[in-house]
Amino acid sequence: MEAWLATLEPFKRLSPGERQRLALVTREKRYAKGETIFRAGQPSDAVWVVKTGRVHLMNYLADGKVSTTCVMAQGETFCCLPALDRKPYPADAVAAVDSTVVRISIEAFHHAMNRAPAFMQDTLCLFCDRLRQIEQKGCMVYEPAEQRLAKVLLGLAKKFGSTVPLTHQELAEIAGITHETTTRTLNRFKQQGLIRSARGRTTLVRPKQLQALLKVSKPSGSLTYVIELRCPPGYRSG
């Protein structure tokens, strides 16, 4: 376990001795596809790492639809925020495929942060990255389906490589669009030669062209508001 943790962020910033102490109190558990690891609102008691498989962090909307806020791939750590503020889990964690997840108690994680400032710094950076992802997802509600789906595919390709192993329904839940719109948009991408698709998999063939879809200019006549903030005299940042 210590050797495996040494390959992962943020644990590689710990000394071998600290990693070994952490490894001694970790627990592995296997979850079948669709099984819930924890639920939103449940008291947070651990930080989690995906050892094998894939975990989705999900919220259920008032209309019954599912919104996937984060996709956790093999080797990724999740739920650092509850470890920092000890507030309840903000989302359900569900095994998207058969998965093995490593559980690290909040107490052990806190102890490691207190003893290793570099580990704490990397943990905060990891949290900031996740916060940025959620912010970007929130901004997508103002974008057309084509741009949303292109952004989702490009983001997932950074985790999984050129072949993204998610179903149309899973992509729809991330992009915040319907299954039908997702399928229709992916078929259009396929006809344009941007992707190839098979059951449960989408391969990015021309990622640069997908990226270009994100740079589409705003429609003529649209308004942009700019707010200028002025600092008081004598103010110095930092």
Task: Label each residue range with its predicted role.
Residues 1-33, 77-78, 82-83:
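Cyclic nucleotide-binding regulatory module and flanking cytosolic helices
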Residues 167, 203-222:
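Short, cationic-aromatic polyanion-contact patches
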Residues 193:
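Glycine-centered, phosphate/nucleic-acid-interacting loop/turn motifs that mediate DNA/RNA or nucleotide
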Residues 34, 45-58, 73-75:
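Glycine- and acidic-residue-biased ligand/ion/polar-headgroup-sensing regions
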